[in-house]
């Protein structure tokens, strides 16, 4: 039905009461026993109707799913935005069904997208509320049809709403509170983006609707339509526009969570975000580095690079390492505690790769990086490319939940600094440098920790690498100087922020050796040499209590779990995009440690069973020979 001002007044009153309640619980803990389930999830998604709640839960239980995502979008469909009663009842039913068997469920809702079912009819969001829409600087509204995205059906109107459209936002938050009242365990917010990701909008830096422009002017005194040079990182106005857009999305998601926990203090908020560490983050305005402290988990539909096929079956070996770098970064952004859910796709018709093989390599790679697994059929959120394989993977993860749901404390005396502001303003330069340093460390089996502006003051390692970090606040620069004053070695590559010019003892590599190495690996991964930049490697490498002798195509992450030192290994040897996603088995992997870690090694291969390897004393060290490594393994000392 058309939106009425009478209904708006009622909603506004409820909203005001809700915000009072939300303020009372604003200090709600993000972590704790009530949210421990989020580190244990093995995810699958199901379309929810008014009649299929029990069947969804039955199917989920049968394949080992824990943490059921259901699709029954209320605010993302204009009709249910206005009248949510039927969908709210369906959500209540699936929550009851999931809880009856000890499972958890959370419901999908759109962020800033809203679809009206009849684009030609009079009752669409765009027709009734054109002032709610995001717009290009030219005034063109963010309104689309079926040709723009696969999820838009013929005859539907798809629009993207400004988060500053206050009447819409009031209704939206009321719907959030109603959803929280159903007993569902979480709200899964998809695509909370500024419209910059559909064809023709990539460089728009939207939105320039009246409400957004007014909010920016109030905050900065600048007219976004006239006073900024879009795309110019040297322009202070454009930098303010980038920061404003990111902060707006942060505030939107934080408000969703406040409203949800006001009704149900145990409610979880999980945004789905596809940009990771790359330039898409400032472009769409959803920066996972900034979002992790504000939400309970992030579901990363993580992909990057050119082309449309980012499935596991089509990944190059270089890609596999870049995904490791991304996932390790996400874990650091969440302080290693907030769960990282990875919605990646294993296979979508690659003729030379078996779906099961791609699924296994993908799942193994995510587990060793500390992420939760979510694979689906093709490029949709639901289904599976091979249900028996998914069932096998999920049951194995469940059997070893004590390992894969535990909080990890990464080990390593080398720290690599992630600068969100540098990435926001100079993404190409920073990301290449950051990846180059981390790839060099990974392939040389040097353990590292990712350091962020939020964890810099606590970093107690020996070496801190700043890869082309061009933008630091005074506080951040002071933190780097304090690290050096404590005896730490600071390594600066590329262009460093001028605030570090006075650091005479810093080791500098202004000619970008890390980027040279990255480019060689990108061009021919197997022919590139991770020791080809010896001066840089010597400057950033540090020793560890554990030394691993293995192929450079084997990734090793060292961490402490519950007081025990563990190694997580992933094998990417022999992989070829679109041809082979089954790694070549690795033999003769040796691990050398000091005696204090013990002389017994436990080895748990991916999808296998635990076995014990006894170490051989060799002077002051103990040496272990691992059994053949297929895809991945976890090992720990005793």
Q: What do the predicted segments below correspond to?
A:
Residues 1-13:
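Bacterial N-terminal signal peptides that target proteins for export
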Residues 45-62, 166-179, 280-290, 355-363:
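Short, acidic/polar
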Residues 250-268, 274-275, 292-638:
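Carbohydrate-binding surfaces of carbohydrate-active enzymes
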Residues 167-294:
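Active-site neighborhood of glycoside hydrolase catalytic domains
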Residues 51-76, 181-186, 297-298, 362-373, ...:
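Catalytic domains of carbohydrate-active enzymes, especially glycoside hydrolases
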Residues 14-116, 120-126, 140-143, 170, ...:
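Mature N-terminal, pre-catalytic/accessory segment of carbohydrate-active enzymes
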Residues 111-182, 221-243, 253-254:
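Active-site-adjacent "subsite" loops/lids of carbohydrate-active enzymes
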Residues 41-45, 68-70, 105-108, 187-189, ...:
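Hydrophobic faces of well-ordered beta-strands that scaffold small-molecule active sites
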């Amino acid at each position: 039905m058309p939106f009425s001002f009478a209904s708006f007044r009622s909603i506004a009153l409820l909203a005001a009461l809700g915000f009072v309640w939300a303020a009372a619980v604003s200090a709600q803990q993000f972590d704790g026993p009530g949210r421990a389930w989020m580190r244990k999830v093995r995810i699958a998604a199901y379309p929810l109707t008014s009649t299929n709640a029990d069947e969804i839960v039955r199917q989920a239980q049968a394949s080992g799913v824990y943490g059921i995502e259901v699709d029954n979008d209320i605010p993302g469909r204009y009709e249910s935005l206005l009248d949510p009663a039927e969908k709210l009842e369906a959500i209540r039913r699936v929550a009851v069904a999931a809880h009856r068997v000890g499972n958890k469920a959370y419901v999908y809702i759109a962020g800033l997208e809203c679809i009206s079912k009849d684009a030609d009819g009079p009752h669409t969001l765009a027709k009734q509320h054109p002032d709610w829409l995001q717009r290009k600087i030219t005034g063109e509204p963010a309104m689309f049809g079926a040709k723009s995205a696969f999820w838009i059906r013929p005859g539907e109107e798809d629009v993207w709403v400004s988060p500053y459209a206050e009447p819409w936002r009031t209704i939206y938050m009321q719907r959030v509170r109603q959803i929280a009242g159903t007993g569902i365990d979480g709200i899964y917010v998809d695509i909370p983006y500024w419209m910059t990701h559909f064809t023709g909008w990539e460089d728009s830096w939207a939105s320039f609707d009246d409400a957004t422009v007014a909010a920016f002017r109030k905050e900065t005194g600048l007219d976004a339509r006239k006073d900024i040079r879009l795309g110019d990182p040297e322009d202070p106005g454009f930098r303010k526009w980038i920061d404003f857009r990111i902060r707006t999305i942060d505030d939107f998601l934080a408000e969703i969570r406040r409203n949800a926990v006001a009704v149900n203090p145990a409610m979880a908020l999980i945004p789905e975000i596809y940009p990771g560490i790359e330039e898409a983050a400032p472009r769409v305005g959803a920066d996972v580095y900034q979002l992790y402290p504000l939400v309970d988990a992030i579901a990363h539909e993580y992909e990057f690079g050119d082309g449309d096929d980012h499935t596991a079956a089509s990944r190059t070996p270089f890609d596999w390492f870049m995904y490791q770098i991304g996932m390790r970064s996400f874990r650091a952004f969440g302080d290693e505690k907030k769960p990282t859910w990875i919605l990646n796709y294993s296979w979508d018709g690659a003729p030379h790769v078996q779906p099961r093989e791609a699924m296994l390599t993908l799942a193994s790679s995510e587990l060793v990086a500390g992420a939760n697994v979510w694979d689906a059929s093709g490029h949709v959120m639901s289904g599976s490319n091979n249900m028996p394989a998914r069932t096998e993977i999920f049951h194995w993860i469940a059997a070893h939940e004590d390992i894969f749901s535990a909080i990890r404390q990464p080990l390593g005396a080398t720290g690599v600094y992630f600068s969100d502001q540098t990435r926001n303003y100079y993404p190409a330069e920073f990301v290449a440098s950051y990846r180059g340093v981390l790839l060099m460390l990974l392939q040389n089996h040097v353990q590292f920790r990712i350091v962020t502006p939020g964890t810099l003051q606590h970093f107690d390692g020996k070496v801190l690498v700043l890869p082309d970090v061009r933008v630091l606040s005074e506080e951040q620069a002071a933190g780097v100087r304090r690290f050096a004053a404590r005896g730490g070695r600071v390594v600066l590559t590329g262009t460093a922020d001028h605030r570090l010019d006075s650091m005479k003892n810093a080791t500098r590599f202004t000619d970008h050796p890390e980027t040279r190495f990255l480019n060689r690996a990108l061009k021919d991964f197997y022919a590139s040499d991770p020791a080809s930049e010896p001066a840089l490697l010597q400057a950033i490498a540090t020793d560890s209590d554990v030394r691993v002798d293995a192929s450079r195509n084997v990734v090793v992450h060292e961490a402490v779990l519950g007081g025990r030192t563990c190694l997580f290994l992933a094998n990417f040897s022999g992989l070829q995009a679109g041809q082979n996603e089954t790694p070549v088995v690795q033999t003769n992997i040796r691990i050398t440690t000091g005696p204090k870690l013990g002389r017994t090694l436990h080895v748990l291969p991916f999808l296998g069973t635990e076995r014990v390897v006894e170490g051989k004393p060799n002077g002051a060290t103990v040496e272990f020979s691992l059994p053949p490594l297929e895809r991945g393994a976890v090992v720990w000392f005793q």
